[in-house]
Amino acid sequence: YPTWHKEAVIDTAYDNGMCHDLMRSLKGKPFFQMESCPTSTNWQSVSKLKKPGMLFAQSMQAIAHGGEGALYFQIRQSRGASEKFHGAVIDHYGGNDTRVFKEVSRVGETLKEIRELAGTTVNSSVAMLYDWDSQWAMEDSQGPRNKGLHYLEAMLKFYRGFRKQGVNVDVIDMTCELDKYQVLALPMVYMFKEGFAKKIRSFVENGGTLITSYWSGIADDTDRCYLEGTPHGLMDVLGIRSTEIDGLYDWEENSFVPVAGNELGLDKTYTCKYLCDLVELRGARTLMTDRK
């Protein structure tokens, strides 16, 4: 139930797309969108109608990300009880000449035209790691921010970057094999389960590109902190050691300034919020430095 029109449509589309990619990646198979609202819900803070064409776009997005179809909730509006004003294919009027009914019909007609896509898969050379255990442990760790770690926001920043380049993304967990991927992103992977660092090391040794972030490799799968430095098991792979992490107030920002003549030609200053990792170089080269 994405909240279309609450923010820029492209931002909602990125959020929705990542959810689809996660569902597809859980089993590596096509999925069904079980509940698609034809118009507006009745339980969100504002019951916003989908603008003309938005139901079609939402349905086709699911197909493009590996879906097999879109099922609706609900077919017919009830006359009473808690969901009597929830969107439906057939409203209280009961006719087939409504705007919503025609939009639903258009989706069905299009699915017939593209039925050869049924059973096909999405090929991705990039994977992002999302781990529920790590998220739960991180959010209950009592530091470095007890309110607002913004984990999903960090995930979406990585995801948007890939999608803006037209790159398909699988959203995987620590048990997945990595052989088919060229790039692996690890946003805020607080918990490294047993053997995970070794798997990542092997991925890099075999030519894979690793992208990670602050607050990664901090604790094991019992939420006990690793000793002898973090990110655990990857300090030599990344060429850094995390020495401290600074939790910023909501109103506070830091900024990063490119080093003159840096290898990537970076020339813009970027702001950062919430968390700032202080690192010690152990073989890595500096591209940017923090201003504060």
PLM ranges: what are they?
Residues 2-292:
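Carbohydrate-binding surfaces of carbohydrate-active enzymes
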